[in-house]
Curated annotation (Swiss-Prot):
Residues 1-20 form the signal peptide. Inhibits voltage-gated potassium channels (Kv1/KCNA). It comes from the Eukaryota. This is U-actitoxin-Avd9b. The lineage of its organism: Eukaryota, Metazoa, Cnidaria, Anthozoa, Hexacorallia. The keyword Secreted applies. The keyword Signal applies. One of its GO terms (molecular function) is potassium channel regulator activity. It is found in: Secreted; Nematocyst. Belongs to the sea anemone type 1 potassium channel toxin family. Type 1b subfamily. Keywords: Disulfide bond, Ion channel impairing toxin, Nematocyst, Neurotoxin, Potassium channel impairing toxin, Secreted, Signal, Toxin, Voltage-gated potassium channel impairing toxin. It comes from Anemonia viridis (Snakelocks anemone). Residues 45-80 form the ShKT domain. Residues 68-69 are annotated as: Crucial for binding to potassium channels.
Length: 80
């Protein structure tokens, strides 16, 4: 009986140590993920608008100020 209790205790201790070592964010760092970090990790990395329109928007700095262009010109705005 004591051997079973000891085995359960050891397994619980291992679980606690492994869980405590995990980092707090998806990227593995100690800082919180920002919205920009989440946008960079998107799986659909393409421009919904024409390439010329997205390039023009990037030049006019709309990529930094407009969520509309950040979503629709991900590749040209460098968000992925």
């Amino acid at each position: 009986m004591n051997l079973k209790v000891l085995a359960v205790f050891v397994l619980c201790a291992i679980l606690v140590v492994v869980t405590a070592e995990r980092r707090g964010t998806e990227t593995g760092g100690y800082k919180k993920d920002t919205l920009q970090d989440l946008k960079k990790r998107t799986h659909d990395c393409f421009d919904r608008y024409r390439e010329a329109a997205c390039t023009s928007d990037n030049i006019r700095l709309l990529c930094k100020t407009s969520a509309k262009y950040q979503i629709n010109c991900k590749k040209s705005c460098g968000l992925c």
